[in-house]
Structures are given as structure tokens and as C-alpha cells.
Amino acid sequence: MMAKTILRVLLSRPCFRRQFCTSGQSTSINPEEIKKFDNLSSLWWDEAGEFRPLHSMNSLRIPFIRNGLVNSRAVSTTKANTSRSLDGLDLVDVGCGGGILSEPLARIGANVLGLDASQEAIQIAKQHSLLDPNLSGKLQYRHGTLEELAEEGKLFDAVIMSEVVEHMNNPQHCFNLAAKLVKPNGSLFVTTLNRSYLSWLGGILIAERLLKIVPPGTHDWDKFLTPLEVENMLADSNCNTRSVHGMAYNILTHNWHWTSNVSINYALHAVKSGEKGSN
């Protein structure tokens, strides 16, 4: 029983997350994935529940995004360690769910648009944001798709795709759309699962087939992307990878830490090439 509990914590992920981009067509949503997610939407802000690893992951995601923006010169080094380090920057959180990442980004000054294909998730996110009056005017949520947002022509200082790409049917199409949203010299941040023996062993064989911690078929290992594949896809979208770091989850403390091993989880930062004549 203890082994099952530990593995369940380790492998619990937003496995029912939305698929934003299934093809190059206008429809980019998988209704079955949406339905699964809608049934669990009320769990987003239970920090000791199914989404505990995502809440804990913010301890890495927030500084990773901030430091990436410093390295790309969107944020000055003198401003980096202030409480409003992202003040004035426009960010879009693709697949924002209930707002676990969107809210803390807004709290350090960013103007954040949370985008999600689940209307239930957006409602949860909106309701929770009302609990903090300081988020007013800094955080907006929208039910929609990347295609719809890209058609509007608005540009952002950074696009964040955290724990989303492993559920895409057509990741190149999604990266192309995401890149269209990024300003020249702007950033794109990705966190996801590697397609490796270790990720198959833990996420598929043990969790789904042996212990049945999560329903069989929850994860599709073939959809996991290696860091090199993501780098190449982003390069085709005119974005150059600046850094890749492995992430590891401690099943006893429920904390994440950085590691040189990218076999299971990793974070990637890319920068969109500037227009001709830009510095």
C-alpha cells in the first residue's frame, strides 16, 4: 500500500490535460480529453491533492521563467530579485488550467493571459483569482485555443507551455502557433516529459499496467518528446533554444529540484529570432 501511495504521488500529473492542437485545422480540441478534465476541475486548488506536484513545481517554474527573461534581456539584472521582477511584461500561459502557474506570475508583476480549452477550468481559475484583489487588472483568463489567439495578432513577451506538449497530437503545429504569439527576441518556455526508457517504465508500465495507479491509456508514451525533438521543432518555428534543464520530484518531501538528468522531466527555454535589423 505504501509503495502504491508513493508512486501515485510521483506519477500524478495533469494527464487529462487538454489537447490544444490536433491538426492545422480550425478545430484544435479533443472533446474526450476536455470531458475527463472537466470532471476533475474542482481539484485544481487542493494543494495536497491530485495537483500537488504542479503546485510544488512552481518553486522551479517561476525562477526558471524569471531567469530566462533576465538572460534574454527582457528583465534587467537589478530588477530580477525584486518582488515585481516581471512588471510590465505580457505573458500567455497556454493550458493554464485552474491558474496554478498564472497567479504567481501575475503576483510578480506580469500581465498574464491564461488560455485553456476547458471552460470548467477557466471558471475555476476566474473564481479563485477573485480571492486576491491584487490580481485585478494583472490577470485575465480566456476559454479558447491557440489558433483563435494567434489569429488576433497580439504579441507577447513570453509564451509558456507547461505540462501541455505531451498531450499534443501535432506539436509542430502548436509550436508554430505559439511562436506567432511571441515578439521578436521574446521567449518561449516549455516543461514536459521526455520519451525515454525511464519515463516509459515509471509512467506507463508501473503506474498504468502493473499497479493501475492511473487508468490504462492515460499517458501515450509515443507523444512524449525528447529535448532534441522540441529544439528542432522550435527551430522550425524560428526559435532558438537557450537552455535545457532536468527536473526531479522527491516523492517523500513532495519537492522538485534541478538535475542534469533530463530522462523524465525537463524544462526548456527558447528565444524567437529578432526581425532583420534588430539587435
Model-predicted regions and their roles:
Residues 56-87:
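Conserved alpha-helix/loop element of class I SAM-dependent methyltransferases that forms part
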Residues 255-279:
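Core SAM-dependent methyltransferase catalytic element
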Residues 212-229:
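Acceptor-substrate binding/catalytic loop of class I
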Residues 6-7, 11-51, 55, 59:
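N-terminal, positively charged/glycine-rich alpha-helical extensions of SAM-dependent methyltransferases
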Residues 239-251:
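Conserved S-adenosyl-L-methionine
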Residues 199-209:
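Short, flexible, mixed-charge acidic loops at enzyme active sites
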Residues 77-84, 89-200, 228, 268-270:
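Conserved SAM-binding loop
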